[in-house]
Structures are given as structure tokens and as C-alpha cells.
Amino acid sequence: MTDETNKNGPEAAAPEEFETAAEPQAAEKPEADASTTAPDPLELARAESAELRDKYLRLAAEMDNLRRRTERDVKDAKSYSVAGFARDMLAVSDNLRRALDAIPADAREAGDAGLKALIEGVEMTERSMLAALERHGVKQLDPTGQKFDPNFHQAMFEVPNTEVPNNTVVQVVQAGYTIGERVLRPAMVGVAKGGPKAATSESETPAA
């Protein structure tokens, strides 16, 4: 029995030794898998840097747009803050002009000193008021002889006239005004009808 045991002992122990030796390799395999799946710190830093740069560029663009909007709003506030007051003053200017137009031509030519002084005073007041409005960006439109533009003019009637191009402003019923780049009040006008079409400039001629 002893000999058989000694004889079979080494052979029986061999598989156990192989199994024991294989265990460290099996334990090392998960470590190898973990090392291959771990994120690269350099790549993480690059991705974070790109994300921060994108956020910075977006913020810079938003701040630039905000600055431009603020500058435009401040400019508009300065330019158009007097629009309501100027519109009210135009009614006063219109009344001064109506008063002057109501004076008959023969009365003007009569040479009455009192009437002449009154006319000069009203005209001076009108000029002074228009000059004050112009200092605040309000300008009077004089569209007589110009082509009718619905952005600046309001057609009140048509005048048969074959001597000027069609849709030419031939009479101003009420003066128009602009403030800055905006129309404060369109000019009320009469336009010609029946004349030739307005000549087209070379720049407006469509290309063949």
C-alpha cells in the first residue's frame, strides 16, 4: 500500500500543481482588461479644453451682440426721444403756415406796415421753430418734382399733367418730416397723371 501510494503520489499531485499555477494568470487577466478600458487623461484634458473654448466663444459672441444692441438702443433713445414732442410741434408749425397762406396776395402787396410786420413776425417764428427741430434731427421733406415714394409720401389726389412723368409729385398739401432715419410724418402730396413713364436709369435696367 505504501509503495502504491508513493508511486501514484507525484502523478496525482501534478494536476493540482497545474491548477494552482493557472490561477495567477486568471487573476491577472481582469487587470489587463482594466488597463485597456481606462480613459486617457490627456484625451480627457483635450476634450475639456475644447468644451471650455466653445463656451468661451459662445459667451464672447453673446456679449458682443449685447454690446451692439445696447449701443443701438442708446442711439435710438437719443435720436427718437423727442419724436412725440416734435410731432406736437409740427401742428404748431402747420398752423403758422396756414396763417401765412390765408393772407390774400393783394393784401401783401398793399404795403400796410402793420400787416407787413405781422407777416414777418410769423415767418420768423416759423423759421425759428423749424431750425430748433432740425437741431434735434427733425428735417422737412420737399418732394416737389420727385417720384412718388409711398415710404415718404401720402398721395391725396391726382393731377392730370402730360408734361411730367407719371407719378411725379407736383403739389405738396402738407409738408412731411423725418427724424433720424425714420419718417416722422409723410408728406401729403398730389401726383401727376397721364404723363410718360419715368425714365429708368442704367443701374435699374435689368440685365439682358
Swiss-Prot record:
Tell where it localizes: Cytoplasm
- CDD domains, per database record: GrpE
Q: Which family does it belong to?
A: Belongs to the GrpE family.
Reported function: Participates actively in the response to hyperosmotic and heat shock by preventing the aggregation of stress-denatured proteins, in association with DnaK and GrpE. It is the nucleotide exchange factor for DnaK and may function as a thermosensor. Unfolded proteins bind initially to DnaJ; upon interaction with the DnaJ-bound protein, DnaK hydrolyzes its bound ATP, resulting in the formation of a stable complex. GrpE releases ADP from DnaK; ATP binding to DnaK triggers the release of the substrate protein, thus completing the reaction cycle.
What this protein is called in its record is Protein GrpE
Keywords recorded for this protein, A-Z: Chaperone, Cytoplasm, Stress response
Encoding gene (name): grpE
Q: Is Transport one of the keywords UniProt gives this record?
A: no
Question: Record's SUPFAM superfamilies?
Answer: Coiled-coil domain of nucleotide exchange factor GrpE, Head domain of nucleotide exchange factor GrpE
Annotated region Disordered: the residues are 1-42
